């Protein structure tokens, strides 16, 4: 009973909670992003995390490299670049003491650049 009461009043540590569930969160992000249908004409086939996550108030971002395969009817089967791994930034949200993801994938920016943009939005600038 005492342990349960303590858990109600303990101060959350979002970065530690993220790291404890990092593999699970990344797998959820990949499944969700892959089901989005974007980029059009490509199927998500795998990913490899890059570096360490970056944290801000209520969010985390993490770099990854994603591998794609052209879909049979997507018109990209003859495009060699369609099979090249692409860097991406995975975005996560921390709300109600829980980490989640909507599968948001940011292309053409680094994790540091996305974190800077997220900090600007959080600060109202």
Report the location of each language-model feature.
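Residue-level signal for functionally critical sites in structured catalytic/ligand-binding pockets
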Residues: 5-9, 82, 110
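N-terminal topogenic membrane-targeting module
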Residues: 2-61, 69
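Residue-level detector of functional hotspots within protein domains
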Residues: 33, 48, 76-78, 85, ...
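Exposed beta-sheet edge and beta->alpha loop/turn motif
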Residues: 66-95
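Low-complexity, intrinsically disordered terminal/linker segments enriched in charged
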Residues: 83-85, 101-125
């Amino acid at each position: 009973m005492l342990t349960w009461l303590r858990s109600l009043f303990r101060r959350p540590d979002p970065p530690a909670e993220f790291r404890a569930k990092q593999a699970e969160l990344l797998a959820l992000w990949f499944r969700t992003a892959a089901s989005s249908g974007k980029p059009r004409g490509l199927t998500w086939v795998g990913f490899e995390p890059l570096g360490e996550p970056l944290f801000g108030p209520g969010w985390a971002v993490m770099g990854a490299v994603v591998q794609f395969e052209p879909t049979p009817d997507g018109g990209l089967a003859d495009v060699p670049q369609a099979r090249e791994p692409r860097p991406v930034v995975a975005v996560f949200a921390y709300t109600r003491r829980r980490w989640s993801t909507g599968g948001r994938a940011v292309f053409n920016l680094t994790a540091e650049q996305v974190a800077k943009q997220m900090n600007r939005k959080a600060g109202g600038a």
